[in-house]
């Protein structure tokens, strides 16, 4: 308190601490450098030694300034000079006569920062310094910027109004100067305006997007100014849409284009992240679409870019992925073809038999039965990407595809026995291979070989064989009686055997046999049946039956008589044949009896008859099983079966055999009751045969 009192006395304050003097002013005033500020102030003093016409003078001084000799920073006393540094900038705008001491400070400078006090003079008594009630002026750096009000998005071709305001205005302060600069205004130009705000109108163009617009505010002649720059956002449809891919959390890369659409290959189970971004104003709505199915989408204010994660890609994830970007001004889209590669899966064979339209699905190791002669179509099917190379093999050999364009299809128009075996479909792929096999089993109806019979000491022994798939069953019929097992009276004995597709059966008949013996062997399976019969027919006078029933002597006699007749016939024919040609002809030995040429036509089911048109007993499908009769014994007989008789002695008139020829074969036809001539087609080409008919009356 002592220092202000001392200063008051030194500076001529005669009314120090007089309670009749008071002043109201803010203690601290802050102003940015270069700006203008008004400091409101009011004061009061006693009405003593002055009248209404007495002039009142007010002064603002910097602290520690001698009021009688020092220069004030501002005063209303015209004859009193002010400080040079504040001249024209500091102004006492208040009327001291009315108790107003307001001060305006323009273009504040850093050196203006100080403590200021007010002094009043009126008449001889009022001479007072308000030393304790001044204010402190603080000058700061100019950091404040003007505010620009502009729509967030500008429509191209539509006029827009922009306002620039600097929020620092006082009534006594002069307004700043506003100006505008920017690429959008280059063709229109702007002029500086003096006001507390500025209004700008212009028409944005599409190319004005992302350009700058700046509002400048100037406060003094020394170039102190403030400015605010805004970035123009002119609306436009989505553009520059970009798709990128991240594999297994690696940095995203753009896919390589293949044609007009980028192409991406990924292995099954791999992690993929598809990213989509587009440039648009306002921000576009992004979406990922797979075959018209929306997988992911984002709002305009959502994160950018839009990601689509495929943690472990599957075969079903393959397809065309489309990213769409859309706003009110338009849309844009871009596609990506994703191919998920994987090795063959679910390899199987589809089967169609006999031209059926229904396909049967078979797995690995399946056995497939097919009837001989039917058509068969095998289709190998698998799932893989890229498609696997398919091929068919049998017994290690690659089969030619039925359709070169589709090697997985194997067609067998007519299944034959040689097709039987394992067929394998191979599916080869860079990522792995698979194969599937099926076993083809060819089924066919029985093929009968036999029956054939021979006389033995115990009686008549007959054998019969048949080949079929599945293996056939054999049974014997004696007349209308089925012979099964063994007879309790030991009159017959049946012995079956089998080996693979062959079935064999032996029949032994004991005891006397009737003259009307009819013995039949029947073979059957699920696909058909075939039978062959052996007949022993009686002659009208009972010669043959008597020979069999009355014993060996009578049989020998009849046989000798027969051979005697044949010998006479041969002797009669041979001279004629020798005169016809000198070239020796091969001769065939015969070991037949009178019963050798009794024609017996075997009966068979429809399937067996059909098979008999394709194959003969002379070419069996597989090697004959043990005990089966040789087909050579049936040569030139065409399903004629006989009961063998005793051996025939050679005629003494026959020429001896040469090394390269055999005995000449002659035929004797026995007709019961009439003659059946043999067809000429049965004779070998170039061979002449003579026939003699022997009739039993």
From Swiss-Prot:
<keyword id="KW-0677">Repeat</keyword>
<feature type="compositionally biased region" description="Pro residues">
    <location>
        <begin position="620"/>
        <end position="629"/>
    </location>
</feature>
<feature type="transmembrane region" description="Helical">
    <location>
        <begin position="551"/>
        <end position="571"/>
    </location>
</feature>
<feature type="topological domain" description="Extracellular">
    <location>
        <begin position="17"/>
        <end position="550"/>
    </location>
</feature>
<keyword id="KW-0472">Membrane</keyword>
<dbReference type="GO" id="GO:0042169">
    <property type="term" value="F:SH2 domain binding"/>
</dbReference>
<dbReference type="InterPro" id="IPR007110">
    <property type="entry name" value="Ig-like_dom"/>
</dbReference>
<dbReference type="InterPro" id="IPR013098">
    <property type="entry name" value="Ig_I-set"/>
</dbReference>
<feature type="glycosylation site" description="N-linked (GlcNAc...) asparagine">
    <location>
        <position position="364"/>
    </location>
</feature>
<dbReference type="Pfam" id="PF07679">
    <property type="entry name" value="I-set"/>
</dbReference>
<comment type="function">
    <text>Putative adhesion molecule that mediates sialic-acid dependent binding to cells. Preferentially binds to alpha-2,3- or alpha-2,6-linked sialic acid. The sialic acid recognition site may be masked by cis interactions with sialic acids on the same cell surface. In the immune response, seems to act as an inhibitory receptor upon ligand induced tyrosine phosphorylation by recruiting cytoplasmic phosphatase(s) via their SH2 domain(s) that block signal transduction through dephosphorylation of signaling molecules. Involved in negative regulation of B-cell antigen receptor signaling.</text>
</comment>
<comment type="similarity">
    <text>Belongs to the immunoglobulin superfamily. SIGLEC (sialic acid binding Ig-like lectin) family.</text>
</comment>
<keyword id="KW-1133">Transmembrane helix</keyword>
<keyword id="KW-0430">Lectin</keyword>
<feature type="domain" description="Ig-like C2-type 3">
    <location>
        <begin position="344"/>
        <end position="441"/>
    </location>
</feature>
<keyword id="KW-0325">Glycoprotein</keyword>
<dbReference type="GO" id="GO:0005576">
    <property type="term" value="C:extracellular region"/>
</dbReference>
<feature type="compositionally biased region" description="Polar residues">
    <location>
        <begin position="650"/>
        <end position="659"/>
    </location>
</feature>
<keyword id="KW-0393">Immunoglobulin domain</keyword>
<keyword id="KW-0399">Innate immunity</keyword>
<feature type="short sequence motif" description="ITIM motif 1">
    <location>
        <begin position="595"/>
        <end position="600"/>
    </location>
</feature>
<dbReference type="InterPro" id="IPR003598">
    <property type="entry name" value="Ig_sub2"/>
</dbReference>
<protein>
    <recommendedName>
        <fullName>Sialic acid-binding Ig-like lectin 10</fullName>
    </recommendedName>
</protein>
<keyword id="KW-0732">Signal</keyword>
<feature type="domain" description="Ig-like C2-type 1">
    <location>
        <begin position="146"/>
        <end position="231"/>
    </location>
</feature>
<feature type="binding site">
    <location>
        <position position="119"/>
    </location>
    <ligand>
        <name>N-acetylneuraminate</name>
    </ligand>
</feature>
<dbReference type="InterPro" id="IPR036179">
    <property type="entry name" value="Ig-like_dom_sf"/>
</dbReference>
<dbReference type="InterPro" id="IPR003599">
    <property type="entry name" value="Ig_sub"/>
</dbReference>
<dbReference type="Pfam" id="PF13927">
    <property type="entry name" value="Ig_3"/>
</dbReference>
<feature type="domain" description="Ig-like V-type">
    <location>
        <begin position="18"/>
        <end position="121"/>
    </location>
</feature>
<feature type="modified residue" description="Phosphotyrosine">
    <location>
        <position position="667"/>
    </location>
</feature>
<dbReference type="GO" id="GO:0007155">
    <property type="term" value="P:cell adhesion"/>
</dbReference>
<feature type="topological domain" description="Cytoplasmic">
    <location>
        <begin position="572"/>
        <end position="697"/>
    </location>
</feature>
<feature type="domain" description="Ig-like C2-type 2">
    <location>
        <begin position="251"/>
        <end position="339"/>
    </location>
</feature>
<feature type="disulfide bond">
    <location>
        <begin position="36"/>
        <end position="173"/>
    </location>
</feature>
<feature type="disulfide bond">
    <location>
        <begin position="380"/>
        <end position="425"/>
    </location>
</feature>
<keyword id="KW-1064">Adaptive immunity</keyword>
<feature type="signal peptide">
    <location>
        <begin position="1"/>
        <end position="16"/>
    </location>
</feature>
<keyword id="KW-0130">Cell adhesion</keyword>
<keyword id="KW-1003">Cell membrane</keyword>
<dbReference type="GO" id="GO:0033691">
    <property type="term" value="F:sialic acid binding"/>
</dbReference>
<dbReference type="GO" id="GO:0106015">
    <property type="term" value="P:negative regulation of inflammatory response to wounding"/>
</dbReference>
């Amino acid at each position: 308190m002592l220092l202000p009192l001392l200063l008051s006395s030194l500076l001529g304050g005669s009314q120090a601490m007089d309670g009749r003097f008071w002043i109201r002013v803010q203690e601290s005033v802050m102003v940015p450098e270069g700006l203008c500020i008004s400091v409101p102030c009011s004061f009061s003093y006693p009405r003593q030694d002055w009248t209404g016409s007495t002039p009142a003078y007010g002064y603002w001084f910097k602290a520690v300034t001698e009021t009688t000799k020092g220069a004030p920073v501002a005063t209303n006393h015209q004859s009193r000079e002010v400080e040079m540094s504040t001249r024209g900038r500091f102004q006492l705008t208040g009327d001291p006569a009315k108790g107003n001491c307001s001060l305006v400070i323009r273009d504040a400078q850093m050196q203006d920062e100080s403590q200021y006090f007010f002094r009043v003079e009126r008449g001889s008594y009022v001479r007072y310094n308000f030393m304790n009630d001044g204010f402190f002026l603080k000058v700061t750096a100019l950091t404040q910027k003007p505010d620009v009000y502009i729509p967030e998005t500008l429509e191209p071709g539509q006029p827009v109004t922009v306002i620039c305001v600097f929020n620092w205005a006082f009534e006594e302060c002069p307004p700043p100067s506003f100006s505008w600069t920017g690429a959008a205004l280059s063709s229109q130009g702007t002029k500086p305006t003096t006001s507390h705000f500025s209004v700008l109108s212009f028409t944005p163009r599409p190319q004005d997007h992302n350009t700058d617009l700046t509002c400048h505010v100037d406060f003094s002649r020394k170039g102190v100014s403030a400015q605010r720059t805004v970035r123009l956002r002119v609306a436009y449809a989505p553009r520059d849409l970009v798709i990128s891919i991240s594999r297994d959390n690696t940095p995203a890369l753009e896919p390589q284009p293949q044609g007009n659409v980028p192409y991406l290959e990924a292995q099954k189970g791999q992690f993929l992240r598809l990213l989509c971004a587009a440039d648009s104003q306002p921000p576009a709505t992004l979406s990922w679409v797979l075959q018209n199915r929306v997988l992911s989408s984002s709002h305009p204010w959502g994160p950018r870019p839009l990601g689509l994660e495929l943690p472990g890609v599957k075969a079903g994830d393959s397809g065309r992925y489309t990213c769409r970007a859309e706003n009110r001004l338009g849309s844009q889209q871009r596609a990506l073809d994703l191919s998920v590669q994987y090795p063959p899966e679910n390899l199987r064979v589809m089967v169609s038999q006999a031209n059926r339209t229904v396909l049967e699905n078979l797995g690995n190791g399946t056995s497939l039965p097919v009837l001989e002669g039917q058509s068969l179509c095998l289709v190998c099917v698998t799932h893989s990407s890229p498609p696997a190379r398919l091929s068919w093999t049998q017994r290690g050999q690659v089969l030619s595809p039925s359709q070169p364009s589709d090697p997985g299809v194997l067609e067998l128009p007519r299944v034959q026995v040689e097709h039987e075996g394992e067929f394998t479909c191979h599916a080869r792929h860079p990522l792995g291979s698979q194969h599937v096999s099926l076993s083809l089993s060819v089924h066919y109806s029985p093929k009968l070989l036999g029956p054939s019979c021979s006389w033995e000491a115990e009686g008549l022994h007959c054998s019969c064989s048949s080949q079929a798939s599945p293996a056939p069953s054999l049974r014997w019929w004696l007349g209308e009686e089925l012979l099964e097992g063994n007879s309790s009276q030991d009159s017959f004995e049946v012995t079956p055997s089998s080996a693979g597709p062959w079935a064999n059966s032996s029949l032994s008949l004991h005891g006397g046999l009737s003259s009307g013996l009819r013995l039949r062997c029947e073979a059957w399976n699920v696909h058909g049946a075939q039978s062959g019969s052996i007949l022993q027919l009686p002659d009208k006078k009972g010669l043959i039956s008597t020979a069999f029933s009355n014993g060996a002597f009578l049989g020998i006699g009849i046989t000798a008589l027969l051979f005697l007749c044949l010998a006479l016939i041969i002797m009669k024919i041979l001279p004629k044949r020798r005169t016809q040609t000198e070239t020796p002809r091969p001769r065939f030995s015969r070991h037949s009896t009178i019963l050798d040429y009794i024609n017996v036509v075997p009966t068979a089911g429809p399937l067996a008859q059909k098979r008999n048109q394709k194959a003969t007993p002379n070419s069996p499908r597989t090697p004959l099983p043990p005990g089966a009769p040789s087909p050579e014994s049936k040569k030139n007989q065409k399903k004629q079966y006989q009961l063998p008789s005793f051996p025939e002695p050679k005629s003494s008139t026959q020429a001896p055999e040469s090394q390269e020829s055999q005995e000449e074969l002659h035929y004797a036809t026995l007709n019961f009751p009439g003659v059946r001539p043999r067809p000429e087609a049965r004779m070998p080409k170039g061979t002449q045969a003579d026939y003699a008919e022997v009739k039993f009356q």
